[in-house]
Curated annotation (Swiss-Prot):
It comes from Fusarium sporotrichioides. SUPFAM superfamilies: MFS general substrate transporter (SSF103473). Disruption phenotype: Results in both reduced growth on complex media and reduced levels of trichothecene production. Pfam families: TRI12. Belongs to the major facilitator superfamily. One of its GO terms (molecular function) is transmembrane transporter activity. This is Trichothecene efflux pump TRI12. Residues 579-598 are annotated as: Disordered. Its main location: membrane. It is found in: Cell membrane. The chain crosses the membrane at residues 42-62, 109-129, 135-155, 165-185, 197-217, 241-261, 273-293, 312-332, 356-376, 381-401, 409-429, 442-462, 533-553. Keywords: Cell membrane, Glycoprotein, Membrane, Transmembrane, Transmembrane helix, Transport, Virulence. Efflux pump that provides the dual role of trichothecene export and self-protection by allowing the fungus to evade the harmful effect of its own trichothecene production.
Amino acid sequence: MTVVVPEEGLDLESQPDDRMRAKALATSAAELPDGYYRSPRIVASFAAFSMNVVATYFVLQASASALPNILQDVGQSENSSLFSTLWTTGQAVSILMMGRLTDRFGRRPFVILTHILGLVGAIVGCTATKFNTLLAAMTMLGVAAGPAGASPLFIGELMSNKTKFLGLLIVSAPVVATNGLSPYLGQRLAIQGSWRWIFYIYIIMSTIAVTLIIIWYYPPSFAQLHGKKVSKREELAKVDWIGIILVIAGTSLFLLGVSWGGQPNNPWNSAKVIGLISSGAGTLVIFALYEVYGKPERPMVPPSLFKDTRGFVCILIISSIMGSMHLSLVIMYPQQVVNIFGSSLKNWEETAWMSATASFGTGAGVVVLGSLFHLVRHIRWQILVGAMWLTAFLGAMSSINRDNKNSAIALSVMTGFVVAWAQDITMLLVQFITTDENLGVAFAVVAAARPFAGSIFTAAFISVYTNRYPRELATHLSSALRGTGFPQGSFSSLLEAAKSGRMEAVNALPGMTTEISSVVSQAMADSYTASYANVYYFAMALGVIPIIASLCMRDLDCYLTDHVPHQLYDRKNAHKDVLEGNSESQPSPIILSMADKE
């Protein structure tokens, strides 16, 4: 049996020697050694990546949910909105850098270095006594989150095309189980113990993960990718350093500006926000022009990717927009739970459990739909149905009000059911259409575009909500107070207190009674209901885009083959040139004949 290599991969102008070695390193599932996927190096590496993914998203979600308690300990800060933003920005930059660099220098050094950086960040976090120190820790942890965000690549490239999702599912299974629990555990640790244990847990898990990586994870090395005639110094000279500087600066400035904007102390028209967004956007425009017209030898984002409109471009659009729709769910739904159902929930634990139902839905969808992906086939129709499903249930989420709590739980689960599955599919599909020597760079563009697009639409979602709520509140409050005897002259004071969202401020007003307070609480919940409905209408409108993109996408079923792009090697064989015939994994006769002709 010969190696199955897709013939129509995106041509990113690879060197002939690199293309030949990529084909030599590839194999098919049938040609792998017996028991390969049960070998210690595979089991240990998969366990390490699984542990890293769990630790990575646990520290983010748990610390974000415990942020009010953390601020009580280290002191309040006007930069509290940056806590998660710096993490997200760090991960986006890390994944984008990972793409081209690991294609050229190998995955192993990047994975080990980012794990070590994560340990340093967690140590800084667990010892922090000032909030700015915590921000530095979250930045380091965000950059260290690159391997977790790139796990569909690192695991997918070790599996055959038709079993990539099963491999990813094995690694993601613990994440599915813990994803919804992380916010709850973060609050419980902060309330009943110490929030610093969030970072301690990360340190424990990440230490085990990096130990397993160092011992067992040996993907193709620099020598295997390029042979022994090419030096790392020569490759470093070809790195697109100008592109790296431009994309890091542009992405960081733009994401910070978008995330900061709309805050009470940073309105959208403030000089700080306008300056960050405009300078970031301008830098990214310069980056794009440089990549197209500067013609770097190893561009960070090859312009030729975008020539494949029915393949790469459609995948990129679907991933970015559905990721943004996912954000509308995971950001807005927990706020809905607090603002609409807060008065009817018994305690913070019940609130935390109800807020996690959307996450439980995403986990269930990954397990159920991911297991069937390669069996159902008809890839673009699967994505089309998923996009229509998500759009329909996001629209249904607009019907949530204070009288249908059970419906809210059910709808949040059903809405989340397809969203993580759809995002994972796009990050696997991009590996189908790319030649094996360029898997990282194509994957990185798709993976990094999600947080970038997500930050833009998140700002838009929040802007829709914050602009709508005061108007809805004035209407509902005025209607609810008729006949209650509340003084008309005090209405403006009541309106301002209600805008804060705090019932303590409402109850502190002169002349406030228990009955009127209850009426105000219900009016506030109804105002929140109407405001969030507009956000879901917006998200539902976005759903038309991935629906159209999935219809335009070409049929990719032909790529569901036994082709395996890369393998893990024994340590003693990890630096041997496969074309010299002394590697543990021998190239196929076809590949050797190609090498002889050269």
